[in-house]
From Swiss-Prot:
<comment type="similarity">
    <text>Belongs to the CitG/MdcB family.</text>
</comment>
<keyword id="KW-0808">Transferase</keyword>
<dbReference type="Pfam" id="PF01874">
    <property type="entry name" value="CitG"/>
</dbReference>
<protein>
    <recommendedName>
        <fullName>2-(5''-triphosphoribosyl)-3'-dephosphocoenzyme-A synthase</fullName>
        <ecNumber>2.4.2.52</ecNumber>
    </recommendedName>
</protein>
<comment type="function">
    <text>Catalyzes the formation of 2-(5''-triphosphoribosyl)-3'-dephosphocoenzyme-A, the precursor of the prosthetic group of the holo-acyl carrier protein (gamma chain) of citrate lyase, from ATP and dephospho-CoA.</text>
</comment>
<dbReference type="InterPro" id="IPR017551">
    <property type="entry name" value="TriPribosyl-deP-CoA_syn_CitG"/>
</dbReference>
<dbReference type="InterPro" id="IPR002736">
    <property type="entry name" value="CitG"/>
</dbReference>
<keyword id="KW-0547">Nucleotide-binding</keyword>
<keyword id="KW-0067">ATP-binding</keyword>
<dbReference type="GO" id="GO:0051191">
    <property type="term" value="P:prosthetic group biosynthetic process"/>
</dbReference>
<dbReference type="GO" id="GO:0046917">
    <property type="term" value="F:triphosphoribosyl-dephospho-CoA synthase activity"/>
</dbReference>
<dbReference type="GO" id="GO:0005524">
    <property type="term" value="F:ATP binding"/>
</dbReference>
Amino acid sequence: MSMPATSTKTTKLATSLIDEYALLGWRAMLTEVNLSPKPGLVDRINCGAHKDMALEDFHRSALAIQGWLPRFIEFGACSAEMAPEAVLNGLRPIGMACEGDMFRATAGVNTHKGSIFSLGLLCAAIGRLLQLNQPVTPTTVCSTAASFCRGLTDRELRTNNSQLTAGQRLYQQLGLTGARGEAEAGYPLVINHALPHYLTLLDQGLDPELALLDTLLLLMATNGDTNVASRGGEGGLRWLQREAQTLLNNGGIRTPADLDYLRQFDRECIERNLSPGGSADLLIITWFLAQI
């Protein structure tokens, strides 16, 4: 399919640099979905609490999305002179086209819609920073992405419309802002919690997969995951947060033997039909930012 026009401005960024960051985005998606065992989520062992998707769907989806990540970076660079609040509207057509390719690759299964939103924002932020010759760090990338999303939660979640979306309903009932709120705030769960936690575990010499699984537990314990709340209500969300925190309090995931606790947690999530997809999206962001 044809690419949406990105901007009338040109970018000075090298294609190799753009492709390098796009490749990291693809690797981040694959790293997350291949990580096993993950409670309630699709992984190499099972399909979690999902009956409509499998591991291969995520692999096809990630490949389809990879081709669009350079477009997000290019738009971020080409729009570097625009007010940050104006950037999001320009990103939407690229995101919608990317989403269309994702659905075609998976025969209609929503595998990575949340990641298109978050990685699209982060890639655009990287493009803007590179174009302006500013440092590309986890903090600058997330703060730039936040500037694109200023006012997003108010605009899209606060409404008096009688026909509420799932996100609007969860916001009104439980105060959950989901992916929009996390992006608008500059991904504080990642920057202040998950990323330093993950990097500290790596510095301590922990196996990277175990470190990532432990970081997933941290996100599950702290994230107001709208995916979980939409399936299990407030009770399901609080149960999942409590169980994840209990595992962390008991030492977390430090050895292969600890994986038995995750397998049991996975079985319980499947029984309750709970899938922490929002936390999985934040784990993708965490791994991605850890590489830059």
